[in-house]
A protein has these predicted regions:
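Nucleotidyltransferase catalytic core that binds NTPs
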Residues: 1-171
Length: 171
């Protein structure tokens, strides 16, 4: 659901039914096992899981990297909506020029629980997030060896090494 007002109405209906609302936000670039474990774990904290997906523009700003994301926002959102543990997916694009999230999603839906990881937000941002959520849960990394950055860097490194090897062979 891309329209926040429509999402709010839907979440309000769930609340009327007594459902506990859980929210998490991420880039979800190069979806991998760590992401999936994290989403499954997040869903365990409530009845409805709302997943915010950072826009392409936002990722470029906060990662300070024009090469990211690898996967366009529409495709990342589509992959997330196919995950059984995810109830709603929405786009996050309220990121200021310094790359800081402005919290519009959680200001509007006021989740019972917001799930994050240690490295996702500064202490100042965590204080802000706590204002708009009844509870904030910080999960550890869900994959010891896998991250989008490691996948990208590992793949690029292998390709560069192979190209260099070919160039050396050709003289």
């Amino acid at each position: 659901i891309e329209d926040y007002q429509e999402l709010k109405k839907t979440i309000d209906a769930h609340r009327t039914l007594g459902h506990k609302i859980v929210c998490t936000v991420g880039s979800w670039d190069m979806l991998h096992i760590g992401h999936l474990r994290y989403l499954i774990k997040s869903r365990e904290y409530g009845d409805v899981l709302v997943v915010g997906t950072d826009s392409d523009r936002g990722i470029k700003l906060y990662k300070k990297n024009n090469l990211r994301p690898i996967i366009p926002q529409e495709e990342r959102m589509e992959m997330l909506k196919y995950q059984e543990c995810v109830d709603y997916v929405t786009l996050i694009d309220d990121i200021d020029d310094s790359g800081k999230w402005q919290y519009e999603l959680i200001k509007l839906i006021r989740p019972d629980t917001f799930i994050t990881t240690v490295e996702s937000y500064s202490e100042e941002q965590m204080k802000d997030i706590k204002q708009y959520s009844n509870e904030v849960i910080v999960l550890p990394r869900q994959a010891q060896y896998t991250s989008s950055t490691k996948i990208i860097e590992g793949t690029v490194k292998k390709h560069i090494e192979a190209l260099l090897s070919e160039m050396i062979k050709k003289g």
